């Protein structure tokens, strides 16, 4: 009902609705826990000691309050064993499938006291998880602490680009943004940032004069390329730009820094609560041990798969979570490595396969995964295959009690935002998604020559 009212309201009223939602987010995120966390981070002199303390608190809490983890600990005869950061590998790893299938047993509080969240993930598997004001507040505190290291502070003029559908599909006006007044945040649409629309985005940026930008890497890069290709001079200079959700390449960084004349600072986390990897003032990537524990499983040479434990996930705990992302380290790790030995050279993430649209251009894994999010746990696995520009086959593995027609209806609606109205979608329900010879399952396959 609220979506219907929003979509049929004047833009000025939509701005008001966005600001009301922003006020609600502020109450959820800027609690006493936010201020306690950011104070502790600012004053901490030994982050590794803080990590040890936090792991002990986190482990004892979920052992007591999560039925799922309590059973795992007993099953592995670890009830009387003291588990620390140093011997965390005695615990079994968990996967996204484990969370998807057991979320009701994993959560540490009653559902009616939690906030329901979702992620499609760039593997194409949808997942529902839960959080609360305590976890959200501390996570936002860390993000703000990270930005403070680069001169950006809470309340500064900010432009954000993300997956929210802030522009109704039938809107004709070239107004691709909405203003969230409580957060002093201009939210710009990721779904319309292409072609000649980009000149309207840049005109608005010059008018708004943001002090910082954050959000989808590919969209920020697309705007930067338009600025460079058309020799546009901006009337503002941001303090720093913080791309997220997608892999940042060296070429993208160079283009963005040149277009906006400011530093780009990379970051890595996940919507479900993985600990942070962030870039310091010297341009080096650092694991942030105050936010969790990082384990690295060697794939080849200096390439390692990440296994993570997130301290900001007390509601849906992530303990030795196989997140499915990889990093390149500066050096190979010794067998009995410690947290301080992990020196990250590059965040690899997942393969950034992309699809194409005549109307929208490149559609990335992140764009597709946000569509899958809207069908929650009904979709177990998914895969998008494109053999020509106007047709996409969508393979879906669904739960036994899922409504196929409802899934198709929801996905068609979401995908129109990402591809436009001229792309045809062909849905096929299958028992499994085939693996590659290397054992991987690809989320997006582009066969266009």
UniProtKB/Swiss-Prot annotation:
Top-level taxon of the source organism: Bacteria
Example of a GO biological process term: capsule polysaccharide biosynthetic process
Pathway: Capsule biogenesis; capsule polysaccharide biosynthesis
InterPro entries: ANL_N_sf, CapK_Type1_Caps_Biosynth
Record keywords, A-Z: Capsule biogenesis/degradation, Exopolysaccharide synthesis
Repeat keyword on record: no
Keyword Transmembrane found: no
PANTHER family (UniProt xref): CAPSULAR POLYSACCHARIDE BIOSYNTHESIS PROTEIN
Role noted for this protein: Required for the biosynthesis of type 1 capsular polysaccharide.
Protein name: Protein CapK
